[in-house]
Amino acid sequence: MIKMNIPVIFQFLKDLSANNNREWFNEHKAEYETARAEFDNFLATVIARISLFDETIRGIQPKDCTYRIYRDTRFSADKTPYKIHFGGYINAKGKKSDHCGYYVHLQPDGSMLAGGSLCLPSNILKAVRQSIYDNIEEFVAIVEDPEFKKYFPVIGEDFLKTAPKGFPKDFKYIDYLKCKEYVCFYNVPDDFFAQPDMLEQIDKVFRQFKRFADFINYTIDDFE
């Protein structure tokens, strides 16, 4: 197993959360750079593992997946200047693509392995819903498989209150069409990253997610 210093990442993020101001950050820039380098190392390892079963992401580098630590506070009541997590969005089409991708989020008491498509344009969202409706048996075989539900018991995070326009209200699986985004989240505790088989567990989670992503991306491929 490749050695990765995850505790260094968590310790910096804990300290940053308690001291989220520019003066403290500037005084601890070296610690930030060390923690960021450790996260990039971790992310590179995860990318390499995923690429063994998803060849589309081979060659992707951490810099292609990560985000600036500076928050955009222009339209937020929270004016703290820095994010208190590190995140990496692994997507063969790029971070801004509508395609489903894999997401790794490290945050003390808030880490997750996730993925999906957020903020889809209305025409693509409608097409995805239509694809689910037309191929519901295939979709249900994925998302209601016990192995999938072990990690992702819920599809989506924000939902319509009623059936989307153009679909029958009495459709048995209408809840799957009410999703405003097609995403999955698997929350993990901090000690998950200290387990000796951590990378093998990440493999299992993202192998299951890939089945969902492949279904959604089949439709999105027509638009990108």
Regions from the language model: what does each represent?
Residues 5-34, 184-198:
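Short His/Asp/Glu-rich catalytic/ion-coordination signatures at enzyme active sites or charged loops
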Residues 43, 47-94, 110:
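Extended, charge-rich alpha-helical segments
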Residues 6, 141-145, 149, 218-222:
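Well-ordered alpha/beta subsegment
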Residues 8, 18-53, 204-223:
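Contiguous, amphipathic alpha-helical segments that mediate oligomerization or scaffolding
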Residues 171-224:
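Charge-rich, low-complexity terminal tails
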Residues 108-167:
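Compact, glycine/acidic-enriched structural inserts
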Residues 74-133:
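Aromatic- and glycine-enriched beta-alpha-beta binding-site module
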